[in-house]
Each structure stands twice: as C-alpha cells, then as structure tokens.
A protein has these predicted regions:
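Non-catalytic carbohydrate-binding regions of carbohydrate-active enzymes
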Residues: 4-10, 14-16, 240-346
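Well-ordered alpha-helical scaffold segments within catalytic/enzyme domains
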Residues: 86-92, 132-145, 175-188, 223-234, ...
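Aromatic-rich carbohydrate-recognition surfaces in CAZymes
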Residues: 127-134, 140-235, 240
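Polar/charged alpha-helical tracts
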Residues: 63-64, 72-76, 147, 189, ...
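An acidic intrinsically disordered interaction segment
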Residues: 91-107, 137-147, 184-195, 302-307
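Low-complexity, Ser/Thr/Pro/Gly-enriched N-terminal "stalk/linker" regions
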Residues: 1-128
C-alpha cells in the first residue's frame, strides 16, 4: 500500500455522527476545525482496529473510543461524556484471519458517510459517486448498515452523478439501479427512467458511452445487468459484448474469472488492483496481503485523482495535500473488504 509520511492521526464519527479528527492530544471537528478536546500528552496509543485512542497525560489517561452507540471520551478523573451519537452496526469479525484489517476497512467505509451520503473521501470529495456508492453498498449490506444511506438513495433525482468532468458515464445506470435495489427503494421513479435510458444508450444489448473518459462496454453492461438482477427485472435484452475491455477485470461480481487479470500493483489507484486480483481468483500478491496481517492506519487510499480537491486536506493533513493523496478511500476499502470476506467469509 502507498504510504505518505504524515504524523499519526485517527478519525472518529462513523455513519451519521459528527466527524472528528484526532492528532497529538487534540480532537477537533472536521467541519470547522473547532476544538472538541485538547491536552498535553506524554504519549499516545492509537488502536485503530478497536476505534480507540489512549492519551497519557501528567494527570493520568484520557480515552476516546467509538462503539455502536457513539463516540465517548473518558478523562483523567474517570468522568465520561458522549461526544456524538447515532447507531451503527460494528461486527467484530472475530476469528477471521484478517480481523483487524476488516475492522479498519469497515471504519474506512462508515467514516465516509457524511450527511447520509456515501462519498469516496469526505475531505476531498463533496458529492457521492455512484460507482463508489455501489461498492460501499455491498459492504453495508454485509454488515447490516444499509439504513445509513437509505434516505440518500430515496432522494436521488439524477440518472448520472456527472462527477467526472460532467460526463454522463454509462456504468452509472447499473450502479444506480443496484443502490436503489439494495436500499429497499424498489419503487423509485428513477428505475423505469434508468431502464429506458439504458435501452436508448445500447447497441445490440450492450451499453455505449464513456466511463473514466473511455469506452468500457463490457464493464458498463455488466453493471447494468447486475442492477437489473438486483431489482428482479428482465435482463434478456442485455448482451455483454465479446470485445476487449480494459475494465472487464474490475468486474468480479458475476463470478467470472480472468486468470491473468491481475498484473502489477497500481499504487495510485489500488482499488483497480484489488478488483483485478479478485477477478483473477484471489491472486493478490503476498506483499500486500502480508501488510494486512498487522495493519496500520489508514489502510485505503487514492492518489492523483483528477476530480479530487486535495487542497481541502491542508488544514488537517498537509503532507497528503502536497502529495495529492487521500486516505481513507471507500472504493479501495470496499474492494479489499469484499476480497477478504469473499475469500475467507465474514
């Protein structure tokens, strides 16, 4: 995994809770930088898999912990207060060979739900992306947290997110249908419009148009089929084309295998590599799997993304801003989480 030299930090505020940034004895609001708590520390321990920070001070120990109810602070005197609260489900993943990694990756997903909206990274992306949102939906379904984004999905009013330079990306249609299906919005008015739009944009049953500035008919059409299937709608008219598509290795959800899908690791966009390794039959290299046995924080990331607003990181993570790097990142976290749970169970 790509690492950028930054001072240790941790994020609190999974799901609908206020987002809080911890570093070096200070806990601040991510929305305006205002101080929530601050103390001079003699030392600190960040226990990322336990969603816990322990601060050693001259007067004793301060603990901040996040659980299924909220974020709680206990000061040196033992006084306890809840800083922000709303329910989330936090499986322990006990017995899983990558238990600690799954705990952190799940945190990476939940921390990036802001105002009920699933975003790739809440610092540098202010709008949800349907692709990342659909991948997050898969994780939320596994962990019983779909309710966190149900209202956002119900309020959707556009067939495309138009986040990539305003382009109406064809894979969005299937991702939208999938999100609506899984969040229980099965009578949403966008569903018939999306089906009609997909037929309009199809040639011989395969979607046309762009995704990430290129044509990817196999990838786009497979997303469409998955979304329709999730809703129980007719897919007989959908025909996945037998043509080369560099994004075909990213779609493992239909169970197909491409033996040589995984090549070299992509440090800037690691979600591509984890998806391809999944499609290739769980072939992620030993180096990157070994890094998850004793994971640091954060695990997931993205670098040099064309639409990310990296300067928004500067008040909190200046080294990340300089490197045009954001972490955690939900598409990456979702691909890793789904790889590990599909391989070993949950």
């Amino acid at each position: 995994m790509k690492t950028i030299e930054e001072k240790p930090f941790f994020l609190f505020g999974m799901g609908a809770r206020e987002k809080l940034f911890y570093r070096n004895g200070a806990l601040v609001s991510c929305s305006d930088g205002s101080a929530v708590f601050q103390t001079e520390t003699l030392g600190e321990t960040i226990l990322a898999p336990e969603y816990t920070v322990r601060m050693e001070t001259k007067k004793g120990v301060v603990t901040v912990i996040e659980d299924e109810a909220g974020v709680h602070l206990t000061d040196e005197t033992g006084a306890h207060r809840t800083l922000t609260a709303s329910p989330v489900r936090l499986p322990d993943f006990a017995g899983h060979p990558y238990r600690d990694a799954l705990r952190i990756l799940h945190h990476d997903i939940l921390i990036n739900i802001i105002g009920g909206k699933p975003v790739p990274n809440f610092f540098v992306y202010k709008k949800p992306w349907y692709r990342d949102g659909a991948m997050m939906t898969m994780v939320l379904e596994k962990t019983g947290n779909l309710a966190l984004i149900r209202d956002w999905a119900a309020a959707l009013d556009a067939l495309y997110d138009r986040n990539n330079a305003g382009i109406e990306e064809s894979d969005n249609l299937g991702q939208l249908l999938y999100i609506l299906a899984k969040t229980g919005n099965t009578d949403h008015p966008l569903i018939p419009k999306a089906v009609e739009e997909a037929k309009r944009r199809s040639a011989d049953g395969a979607l046309t148009g762009l995704s990430d500035f290129s044509e990817h008919p196999v990838y786009q059409t497979k997303w469409l089929k998955l979304g329709l299937e999730a809703l129980g709608l007719d897919t007989d008219w959908v025909k996945v084309p037998a043509v080369p598509d560099s994004y075909s290795p990213l779609f493992w959800m239909d169970g197909h295998k491409e033996e040589h899908a995984y090549g070299s690791y992509c440090e800037n966009y690691p979600y591509l590599s984890w998806a391809a390794a999944h499609t290739a039959g769980f072939t992620m290299d030993k180096e990157h799997l070994a890094a998850l046995e004793k994971p640091g924080y954060p695990i997931s990331s993205e670098t040099e993304a064309s639409q990310a607003q990296y300067e928004l990181l500067r008040p909190f993570l200046p080294a990340y801003a300089d490197a045009r790097h954001s972490a955690p990142h939900t598409w990456h976290a979702a691909e890793m989480f789904l790889y590990l749970t599909d391989l070993y169970g949950i």
